[in-house]
């Protein structure tokens, strides 16, 4: 037996298919009639003659390692093998392409060699037995016997099913691509027994090369029953060659690839790769090589003819057995292949960043990757045909496609394993979620009745090889504040993709409307809600009354400087971080969604008070990075309830909470959705985004049947915390204070009615969460022309117009010259006419109305940077990944002329809200007086479709001015006006200016701060 040098192979057989209840006897999978098991040595030994023993000739050793396992499996354990490499050789056996010393078919019986063949068999059998005895004595003398690993115990029915799949893996080892998907936490129990089948990677076969003979020891588990196929088989080399490079033995492309463990079913075992077979290319080069080696290897393959004939003879019997015993395996295999196709199709949407500076980036990354992983054969660039089963012809194309995309997916997954939400260096310029490949794969079988996906590809579900410690290693510039800047933004693309709107309803999503359209929808929603209340409320009761603000009373503004998570409203969070939910709360929701969906009674059972208090302290101390691994699901669920209960006002706001309750108290059930849509449109944008995230999260919780928490059960447990019911004045600072209860402490009729309305309302909103955040179609029809007129168009020229002007010899800089002159004129006048407003620390923030009368204001943010203007221009122009934490993808589409280019970038949003996509025309100048620089950009129509799950945002104006202000320092001024879609003008007035100030602060912090070290020297 000859295997790979220094190879350690462990085969685990798990059983998983269901059989009839009357099938109670154990399936016997014998190794071979040539083998016997010895209890004393715990090893297998050969009995009699064997056709497996061959001299280690140069041409034979390349093919003999796998047949020891492939040829002697029992007929009840092997599926059929078939190969159709070409139409001409459809009837020819696949193994007939193996180099043969003669021109006769490989499977035909040798003529005139029966007598000599028996002698050869007996001779090699005796020598092999003697060699095994010597190895056994040597092993006992050195005391180096290893204990076989214990495999997981499974039920009898699951064990028999996995035997079929594992044996199928034996026959298809090297031909079937490993599945790189990560199973969901809700399906972990059902998926544990599939690991043996999913653990076989695709091998890349090369021409057989002469290799030195190695000695190997076969380890059999201690609980192995003689006459049965062992559940765990380990084959290890006894005399490894330390100087031999791993590339000398024919490994698969993903062997030794430590960054990828997703294809392995068990993290504690390695699947064997039968890679000593000759390359399965067309027969011409193989036959030519066979003719060259015919004289040297004469007689080497003669003893294999009867073995191959035996293997080929198993096909019909195994095919009949598999069809009769396991008829239900075929649909499951087909479903798995369909999931694999979806994963491969959506894997191309993994986030990447590319710049003009980095040329040949893919080649450099491939070189660095191959050097980082030892044993990865970089010289193997060819692809081989795939061998598939006769029973599954429909999976040929997916497997061929998977084989072709394997190198790209290996590179993408390696980048995922080492990247988090933080920006990275300009050399690699790739920002990805740790699980984007699996996150984007949402199969139809994993969608619940409401269209919500339960497929999670989060860090907690990934294999150990893909997990990174918290906090993860950063890949950034390595200078300045980037060394200490925390990993703040969470990448949760699985949540985004699972709640992606359909093509029919995509245009009606609130987060895809322009600011002017949102303003019109507010007016229409107020009119509609007023009509509902006037129609269904009792005339003599004041049910639809909003209290007027008291102008003479001074409201003291709360100070949130000492608070980070609990008790801080969403508006403050979005001004601080750009997202209305704290990072730690998003991480808690992600932890529950990915790992705790099967916890019975989640959000109903109470957690431990001391542990919940400890989690609260962790959130306040480190709001950007909290690890919930190992925490109780009930503790984390109670933490979420406390967060919404401790908000200064309900998420529905104090003004609209009563309105929401009255909708479900007074209106008939058929009007609930229309009234709730109108009330939702009236919410502040940051509150509406938090509510949408919460409802989508709760719908995923309710979709998991294991936890027994339906939408109604969740509403009963969460309605008091979300609506702030039964809250006294001393317990909360919310202005919505409940009326006094009766003296006996029982809730009054009003309290009971509001509790019932809150429970019914929250249950309805969880069930119809997809429709709740859509614009009513009839409202759009009523608004008619005014709604269409509010839709903005890119201010810049169309790309076709630019190309025509360029062909006519017109300078493209003329299209941006107006913006350049406006910026220089404002700078010369010291930005006169701007109104200063409070902003973040160490920044100056100002605003003014737009000259075109648009409701969106223009915002200006300024700060000083410890770098000259040219360096700051390069940082803004080419190194956006170093200071923009939300950046997903960036690239220069086309360089139109020196100093003018077409630029495309995508920024992320809080899940499940869509990302923002920008296509801008930008121009820069570095020849200003005193060494100043500027950069101006604005959106244009790129004549290309909007990316899936993304929203095309509009950059109306973006101007950067870098002015020198001392030795090695510059003053950076950023003027911006943009429509990000899905936000009202009020949101831009309260939030957008702070986001601009945060942007210039991040650019400033990306440079190192020079500090004088030591005392000042007297001259």
From Swiss-Prot:
Record keywords: Cell junction, GTPase activation, Methylation, Phosphoprotein
Biased composition (Acidic residues): 334-347
Localization: Cell junction, Focal adhesion
Highest rank taxon of the organism: Eukaryota
Segments of skewed composition (Polar residues): 100-115, 418-430, 437-455
Modification Phosphoserine occurs at: 108, 234, 237, 494, 502
Biased composition (Basic and acidic residues): 134-147
Gene3D superfamilies: 3.30.530.20, Rho GTPase activation protein
Domain annotation START: ranges: 805-1013
SUPFAM superfamilies the UniProt entry points to: Bet v1-like, GTPase activation domain, GAP
Annotated disulfide bonds: none
GO annotations of cellular component type: focal adhesion
Keyword presence, Phosphoprotein: yes
InterPro entries: Rho_GTPase_activation_prot, RhoGAP_dom, START-like_dom_sf, START_lipid-bd_dom
Biological process (GO), any one: signal transduction
Sites of Asymmetric dimethylarginine modification: 168
Region described as Disordered: spans on this chain: 92-122, 134-154, 325-355, 406-482, 731-754
Cited SMART domains: RhoGAP, START
Oligomeric and partner information: Binds both the SH2 and PTB domains of TNS1.
Cited function: Accelerates GTPase activity of RHOA and CDC42, but not RAC1. Stimulates the hydrolysis of phosphatidylinositol 4,5-bisphosphate by PLCD1.
Protein name: StAR-related lipid transfer protein 8
Classification of source organism: Eukaryota, Metazoa, Chordata, Craniata, Vertebrata
